[in-house]
Amino acid sequence: MATPDDPATPALSLSASNSSSPTAASSVPPPTGTSEIQYDDVAIIGMSCRTAGGNDSPEKLWRFIMDKKDASGESPSWRWEPWVRRDTRNAKVIEKTISKGYFIEDLENFDASFFGISPKEAEQMDPHQRLGLEVTWEALEDAGINPQSLSGSDTAVYVGVDSDDYSRLLLEDIPNIEAWMGIGTTAHGIPNRISYHLDLMGPSAAVDAACASSMVAVHTGRQAILAGESRIAIVGGVNVCLSPALFHMLGAAGALSPDGVCLSFDEEARGYARGEGAAILILKKMSHAIMDGDHILATIKGSAIAQDGKTNGIMAPNAKAQELVARKALKQAGINALTVGYIEAHATSTPLGDPTEVSAISAVYGVGRPTDTPALIGSIKPNVGHLEAAAGAISLVKAVMAVQKGIVPPQTRLNKLNTRVDWAKSGLHVVRESTQWGTEDSPRRAAICSYGYGGTVSHAIIEQFAHAADPFTASTSDDNHPTLLLLSAPQGKQRLPAQSAALAEWISPAGAHESLRSIAATLATRRAHHENRAAFIVSSHTEAAETLNLFSKGAEHDSIVQSRTLDNNINKQIVWVFSGHGSHWSGMGKQLLQNAVFYRTVAPLDIVVVQELGYSAIEALKTGRFESSGQVQVLTYMTQIGLIQLLKAKGVHPHAVIGHSVGEIAASVAAGCLTPEEGMIIVTRRARLFAKVIGCGGMFLVSLPFAEVLAELGGRTDIVAAIDSSPSSCVISGLNAPLEEYVEKLKNRGIRVFQVKTDIAFHSPMLEVLSKPLKESLEGSLNPQPPNIKLYSTSQADTRHPARRDAEYWVDNMVKPVWLRPAVTAAIEDHYRIFMEVSTHPIVSHSLDETLAENGASDFTTIHTMKKEQSAEKCILHAVAQLWTKGVKIDFKFLGRQWSREVPKIRWSHKRFWKEVSTGSASAQTVHDPDKNNMLGQRMVVAGTNMTIFTTALDESSKPFPMPHQLHGTDIIPVSVYVNTFIKATGGKVLSKMELRVPLAVTNDVRNVQVIVDGQSVKVASRLSSSDDMSWVTHSTASWENEPSANVLPSLDVSSVIKRIGTRVSETFSVDYLKKTGVSGMAFPWAVNDHYNNTKEMLVTLDNDPEHETMSWDPCSWGATLDAATSVGATLFSREVKLRIVSHIDRLTIYSSDPPPKRYHLYVTEASSSQVHACSADISVLDLSGTLLARIESIRFTEVEATPTKSTSIESGVHQIAWVPARLSEKPLSLEQIVLVSEDDAKLEQYANELQRQAPKIVKLTSAAKLRDNGALFMREKNATVIYCPGTVTSLEDVASASHRFIWEVATAIKFLVENSISAKFFVILDRTFLAGSPTALAQGALYGLARVVASEHSDIWGGLIDNEGPLFPVMPLKYVQDQDITRYIDGVPRVARMRPFTKQQRYAPSTARTLLPKPEGTYVLTGGLGALGLETCDFLIEKGARRIVVISRRDIPARSQWSKASENLAPILERVKAMEKTGASIYFVSLDIGAADAHQQLLFALERLSLPPVLGVIHASGVLEDSLLVDTTSDSFARVLSPKISGALALHKAFPPGTLDFFVLYSSIGQLVGTSGQSSYAAGNSFLDVLAAHRRSQGDNAIAFQWTAWRGLGMATSTDFLTLELQSKGITDVGRDEAFQAWEHMSKYDVDQAVVTRTLALEADDILPCALLEEVVVRKARAQDQSAPASGNASDSSGRPTASADLKPWLDVKIRECVALVMGVEDIEEIDTRVPLSDYGVDSIMTIALRQKLQSKLKIKVPQTLMWNYPTVSAMVGWFQKQFEEGQ
């Protein structure tokens, strides 16, 4: 029997990252034209470039050079505009600056989404980095290296760069600097970004050697390869010219061409022209390149770098140094200079540079040559300019092209050779026209020169690589066979059509000379494989072009397979499913037999068939005549075995297998249990026995579930349910007559029935007669082995049962039911989602789809290998294509080794990304002087009018007052600055009818401000400078007069007023009152020295800028004095604590012509008009003798509306935790299986007994480790409930270790449930923990904080923590309290935590002596005292009277004599300590790990040695923060965080027992109350502190735990954007240092053990409550008055939510993408691929919080912190929100 010819088979791997055996290289003959290959040479295997003139590839650049084109032109004017606007002096200079050069068009464009970079980050990236990324990707594709294959490799990246224009543009705009600008604007960011995005682990460095940078980078990369540091090196350079600064400098130095062109070697050369561009080359050792099948463009024979030493000037060229570095490179290469035919010169076109360089080149390469064969020289610079840092690399690209093509291109812009060079004697010739470059006896060689103006000289020698015949060339016979062309793209499928069109355009006719197979191999093995994929099954170039064009136009075709890969978190391993009887058709084997792999596989099996049955199965396949069911099964098995090998030959391998009926035999072969021959023995011997039962029975597919049919048939044996096919169908089997009768009944009931093509009742009792003969015939013929991959049984009810595939198994397979649905379900439960039916026609694929859908698998695929009457070859390729487009890894070696560099490369999808900087800091624009405390900038008189306008720009850099003056967190211009502005603008002394309309905010955004004096009126107006179309806002208006009326009030008798008022109040009275109203600070520094006050009048003595002898601002300014007047004046109305601001002044008069004094009096009385406006005052400013200096009449203070919280007083910033009755769910939790975990045997038994009536199945375990190790075996129920009950602790000594153990038990259980995707609810049951009455309660206390974080990170798993205060198991809260993190079960009532204000009833009685404040006579112990919060606490204690503080720290503090030598980190801390000690306090240090086992003893010993007065107070502020999600934590990381919190607190508890101190203060955190994700360990430690405080107070101690919010700018998590957003997402804010200590003092009045210190944010009327804890304290803004108005763009989006389920998903898709686009800064939501993880778009942690807030606001549903972690794509989030809405949450 003839065997088909074997097709060519690839011999080597095509992956660039996979090396073949070392012997492969030696089998390749040396290239022709060389005497010998130096395998240690470094090969250039790929390159790409970008230059002016639209040259975006080496080929385009070559044509450009050959055509003598040049790309010189003007710099785009918009680039220099920011510098023009930055300083008024710049414009004239820039006008005279040379602006011509060689510029890349559309430099601002970048394909950010391709690299997963967000628009916001992209605009903060230097174009150097953008060019570097794109050109590197192009170069790797040119090299035939899949960039993704380099991940984790030692690939080196060296990139030359020496300009930072974009960095200066962004970073000199200081107020607008953002986080990403750091890495985005650095030089090292260029190579580092390449390494980062490609996940490279080799060296990565920027090289700056001026204009030699890129050649130094090439040399360094070559050295890295030769040294064995890196297998591949990415080298080159990038240059961008954005700023006029360097143009101006170079022009001034005479280095630049006035005409903006390079005239290398020309007599008229007068300087160089700057050029933009990038060139990247890919290097690899020659031996590796040959082994890997790379195309070698040239070899680098030698390279050298040096410095030219001390010359006439550091920038002067040195011919001797240039000569020496060339000779060094030649020596290294072992090459005679006379064999180098072409030199690519540096040739900068400078009068000195060109002659100097030519003399050096002549000395090396020209001298000694025959006059008729001079060395040829040229330079690329007249074509594309001097690319400076990239100059050497672009020259190298040109030289490589010349060496490859055998042509020396012509020199551009050469009219007359430079006469300073003696060309006749030089041995050199400048090529004016393109010249053929042929050599007979040696390869073409070229030299490249590159020099830096700082003195760096570099040189390289390259050599032609003449390609040998490829021994692995694919057979031309393959050209008519179908093959696969693969295209892929990241971030949205919209890229694919453009790629397809480009490939179609090239493939015919341009690509016709390339074999279709080599094109396919290029795309499959040497290009990246992204998420969006399309595969094309084609047989010719013409068909390929047509199919690709169809796809590019959006058409569908059978030859096109398109899909996005399955999500990253989905298992992409394949399950092969071998179907059983019924897939056969007459022509199924005819084409398959033409395939050599198939034929070789089945030929040995045909021998077995002939021996066993007496006929040839191969002949039967050829004829297509199948005479019996037995023969069908033989041929079915044979084709399946052939398909196994055929699929493997196509690079497809299974990871699990399932067999259906007779398909189980082939499945067992695929799994390695049987040999193919053993399988055929089973099939043939069964077939022989089937002759006894043929024709007696049959089978039908029925559209009813298996269980239903089984019940309906009862115990019948004549008809049975034979195959459990899918959730809605099964196959019945039986004797013909009763089967037909039953089927007829089913049809009459309207049930669909289909006959199976068989005359045997398989899987029925009818075949039991064959059982014994079959078993006997197989015994001794089989040697079954264990499977080598996952194998599911369909012959066993337990489909995972590892039954041996022996004779008895195959009897069961023949007689017993087929459990296909359970087997597929088991595979689904084991996370398989890709199923391939291995058969000649699909018969179970529908059942697979149905079972997958039934099991909730939303992202899956089923694929079949062949289909009836269709080309087998194309069907199999179609299946391979389907697998690949779903993300399955396919080994494409079958496509061969040959590949093509000409296949079109990446098509970029460019968009503009450019950071629009402000016009510069406002203070740089000849604007107002902030120290004069006014807003008067440039003055302009409007012609023909009585109007004068002062214009200025206002931002934080030009704030006209020295200190923060905030309203609702934003600085606003104080009234005193308006007054000072009006006085100075008009020159008047009187202002009247002054209105304060709208606050003028001072922010980073520059505002244009106008002060307009129009006749006798004056006003201030502003608008944002970036919004020219925005209308002007008027902030304040007034009328003015020149001089006051003659009616001057007499001097005030100050002593008489003081006597009349009588009452003297604290100097801090005014400041304290203003703080209560929420005013955190004054606009100017002033202090009250004396304050006399009653309800009608005040006399106050003040000092401006009290810490200085003279004031630190313009002495003529009334700003500070009037700020004090308006601030202190407001306190006349202190009867009610309300925030008020000045809204109106009737009249303000300045009487004095002298500057205001530093010290002065204020006299304040109620205004006579106060009956109309209750809060109006008259204020007089007097000097110390009582003389009137200024007077404000009827200044009106108006209450501020819509303050962000109920009140800004300190009372509103402290809260208690109250426990309110929980809302009960109408639907109880379903308890199908309960797993009890506890180390307490007695509790385990008690709870198990009490729960017996609640759940049918209860499992008891003594540890979470046992759950982890064995849980997967018994936790199969969908509604499992895991309950953890920590044990009992009897001794205080065991509390710390038990606490850690309890925490880790919970962590272990949660990790197990998450990692195994088990659907369960997890509960923790505590025993009176909140009451804190025992060591058990203390040890369990840490679980409170842990519970809230787990609830946040894993809300789908978390059932709740129930703190049970009753004797029985808390069944009721377990079942009916849902979606709560913690529940206390008290007297049969479940209660949950809510924040509430403290009540007066909680205060101490007035006679109580307890306090939280220090006394001078005591000693105070402070842990964590050297941290940010600790130092502030130390300062506060000293402020309040402490004189001795002992600071406990793990740091070793040097002796005071050594403090001057302290480390950089420690020195500022010690300086702070010294400053505090200057107040008279003493600070002592004890170096101690407070978490150590014997810490309390060490502490007491240390205190004893210090011999200080008794310790009266302890503050425990120590802590360690290690943020990590619970599933990523380790026991050790928990221990590090818990040690200072739990062990440290216990050490202090032991050292200072309850009742021995005045106070015991613990620093806890609000993070554990609101469930801050990532802080499970920190939260656990802090909640322990809460319980310890309660424990001590229950024993009579004055202990309190402060549950602090973040302290603004302080602590372990300073107030960054991330922290601010995180707090806002919880509905809370940070507090300032002073607010925190005000809270401390305030709580000194209360008899409580805990205090939550935070402020809440105001919510919109319909906003979702961000945290249930805030339910009773949050303030909601009033609804808009017109609720009946039609919804506008600002109306609630959720109001339009569709009610129909079908419409909800697309609606959610749009809404979520709108939110994502808003956060990312993307204009078109279509740019957001719903299947791409948001992290791939560059969404970082800050954006994640912002997105969560946007989603919560738009969709009006609470969004968990972990949503974007657990549901990382838009598609996944749509599913989550849809579920929430449909469940009515």
From Swiss-Prot:
Gene3D superfamilies with a match to the protein in the record: 3.30.70.3290, 3.40.47.10, ACP-like, Malonyl-Coenzyme A Acyl Carrier Protein, domain 2, NAD(P)-binding Rossmann-like Domain, Polyketide synthase dehydratase
Induction or repression: Expression is highly induced during plant infection.
Domain Carrier: 1706-1781
Region (Ketoreductase (KR) domain): 1418-1608
A GO term, aspect molecular function: oxidoreductase activity
Biased composition (Low complexity): 8-27
Residue stretches of biased makeup (Polar residues): 1681-1698
PROSITE patterns referenced in this protein's UniProt entry, alphabetically: CARRIER, KS3_1, KS3_2, PHOSPHOPANTETHEINE, PKS_MFAS_DH
Entry EC number(s): 2.3.1.-
Pathway: Secondary metabolite biosynthesis
Catalytic residue positions: C211 (for beta-ketoacyl synthase activity), H346 (for beta-ketoacyl synthase activity), H386 (for beta-ketoacyl synthase activity), S661 (for malonyltransferase activity), H965 (proton acceptor), D1123 (proton donor)
Start and end residues of each PKS/mFAS DH domain: 933-1206
Residues covered by region (Dehydratase (DH) domain): 935-1203
Domain Ketosynthase family 3 (KS3): 39-464
Family annotation (InterPro entries): Ac_transferase_dom_sf (IPR001227), ACP-like_sf (IPR036736), Acyl_transferase_dom (IPR014043), Acyl_Trfase/lysoPLipase (IPR016035), Ketoacyl_synth_AS (IPR018201), Ketoacyl_synth_C (IPR014031), Ketoacyl_synth_N (IPR014030), Malonyl_transacylase_ACP-bd (IPR016036)
Region (Malonyl-CoA:ACP transacylase (MAT) domain): 575-888
Highest rank taxon of the organism: Eukaryota
Keywords: Acyltransferase, Multifunctional enzyme, NADP, Oxidoreductase, Phosphopantetheine, Phosphoprotein, Transferase
EC category: transferase
Positions bearing O-(pantetheine 4'-phosphoryl)serine: S1741
Cited function: Polyketide synthase that produces (R)-mellein, a secondary metabolite that inhibits the germination of wheat (Triticum aestivum) and barrel medic (Medicago truncatula) seeds. Condensates 1 acetate starter unit and 4 extender malonate units. The nascent pentaketide intermediate then undergoes an aldol cyclization and is aromatized via dehydration. The (R)-O-methylmellein isolated from P.nodorum is most likely to be derived from (R)-mellein via an additional methylation at the hydroxyl group. Interestingly, no O-methyltransferase gene is encoded in the vicinity of MLNS on the chromosome.
Protein's name according to its UniProt entry: Mellein synthase
Organism: Phaeosphaeria nodorum (strain SN15 / ATCC MYA-4574 / FGSC 10173)
Record gene name: MLNS
